[in-house]
Amino acid sequence: MNQLEEIVKYVIYKCRENNHPVTETLAAFVTQTIYNPKTDRFYLEDKLTASQVDELKATVLQKLSQIDKPNMKTIQMQISYDSAYIESEIQRQERIKNQSIETGKLTDEVVSLEIKNAKDFEGLTVLFKKIFNFLLYKNKELMYDGTNKTGNQDSENQATQFNIEKEVAAGLESVIPRAALGPFVSLNPSEKVTQLVELSNLVIGIRLFNKWIQKGGIGLVPFQDLLEYEGRDLIERIRQEAFEVIENCDNYTIFFQNVGPGKIKISDEQFKQYKDELTFLRQYLSYILSIQEDVDISENSVDSNQTRYLKEIKDLETLLKQKSSAPKEQVYPKFATLAQAYIQLLEEKKLCLTRVKLFELLQEMRKGFKLTLPRNLILTAKNISQDPSNEEQVEIEYSEDCGIERLLPKNTPDFMQTPLDYLGFCLWSIVKRDGLLLPGKPALGVFRYKDKNCVFSDEKSINEFLSDPQQFIQGVINQCRKNPELIHLLRMDDSFKNVNLNIYVSGQEGGHQLSNKLMVDKGIETPLHFVEKRLDPNYCWNEWELRKKALQMANIRKRQTKACQTILSNFKVDSEAQTYLPKDNETNTGKTEWDIRKFAIEQAKKKGIIAGTDRAPYPIHPRNYITGLRDKDTN
């Protein structure tokens, strides 16, 4: 965790503890823009020690506790407005992106479809369905006008959906019937895409004309709803608000021009209070004028498209009046123009509703801000400015060899289109009067130094700038460090890239940048097979084993049991059984045969079976062998 994250988390926790929570964006911006008077830099521009970190934490908490101060109100307005603007732009880009992706998929299905030839009926039928799906999606896009999330109130009605499909199918059949798709098949991919776009405009134009004559166009936003809706008077509201803010700015400008020795005297605290109030008004006016510029462009677009739409409707009524058909060379371009004007009007309505939300956000911020400059001081300043004796005549001491280019209306073509740096405020008053924003006078000349076009409020300021221009260029940066609300107002983001409000707001709290999304690598690991509580002992994951079992089961179903069963009829399955070995019938001991016989005789005598030895079971029969008989010599 770096020092910024550590301090921001601590500040957010402490603010919640003190019962005045702040957003992470505000806490981070204030933390990064705390001025260190010892180094004339921001604290976080240098590596901080532990004591400096504690000092910075205390300073941030003290500044956030003064949330009602004019300078903090200005920072709050900058963050709130830029966050809302970026969020609306992200939503609009996401919507356009999703529509483009879906349209691309449907277009690819049509373009990539391969058909044998122009007489392939089945292939042409499939192609016709895919073209119909493309047109149906393009027509359903027009059901959303920005006032709701689901389209018109009857968009979910099945009957309405059916009627939309019916109208789209009829429009497709009238422009290019199914049997006439042969020439479309022979086109190359780019030509097919062009034809699809033109076909979409034609079908939409036909449905728009049918809606105008009240014979169809179900689901389409009525033409009057594109011209009359809440927020259509935004341009008048903005002009009225801008007029009031400009009047207040002029009063503050006259007051500060007459503050000084011999004129109006105020304390330093009052000077800072009124100066910060003027800064808030300048920033508020900048946002108001930015919205007004966008609304003016939008109004011009609405007027031109409204004129085109009504003109094409009138021409189509003339061509198709009391006629069932007309030459396609005359009506097709008008249907296409009608669709294009309608789509642009629909898009302008969505943008206008977004600008209304931004304008209401600014008005809410303005209502919570109170101006404290007394009316009597304003009147005193106006009286002093009307006294001609207070005007000093000073000549501008300019020479061409000073390295500064002077642009005047008489010697510069397109002088009024010259871009002014620092938003056209007097450079001298910013540097010498603690960031005071007084308007410069381009009529005195635009002074270009190091690609910076600077203007000043009087001749005396110009002469001081000409004597040391680098001091003023660097002085603006120093004043932005002391007054961080000027960084965004004076377009000084390039000089403070680490505290660029646009990039910082878009990258915080799950946001994204407008140009490119913030991409990160992220991975997660999960087990291939989760261990289940219930285990199946017969579970088998091997597909080959399952296939083998399936074949065996299918083979068994076709078998029949015979009366005589052999090994061959038993499906060649080896059957084995395990039993105990048979017991031994004989016992081997250490006794001899004579001992056994003697034991048997003794047992027989005990039982009275044998009375004497002559009746023993094994009596001894003596035998005598005589030799030498039959005249044989034994010697």
UniProtKB/Swiss-Prot annotation:
Disulfide bonds listed in the record: none
Highest rank taxon of the organism: Eukaryota
Biological source species: Tetrahymena thermophila (strain SB210)
UniProt function note: May regulate cilium motility through its role in the assembly of the axonemal RS2 radial spoke.
Keywords: Cell projection, Cilium, Cilium biogenesis/degradation, Cytoplasm, Cytoskeleton
GO biological process, one term: regulation of cilium beat frequency
Knockout consequences: The mobility of cells lacking CFAP206 is decreased. If their number is normal, cilia are slightly longer and display uncoordinated motility with abnormal waveform characterized by decreased bend amplitude and decreased metachronal coordination. Cilia axonemes display a classical 9+2 organization of microtubules but their shape is abnormal.
Protein family according to the UniProt entry: Belongs to the CFAP206 family.
Keyword DNA damage: no
Protein known as: Cilia- and flagella-associated protein 206
Coiled coil: none
GO cellular component: ciliary basal body; motile cilium; radial spoke
Main location (coarse class): cytoplasm
Annotated localization: Cytoplasm, Cytoskeleton, Cilium axoneme
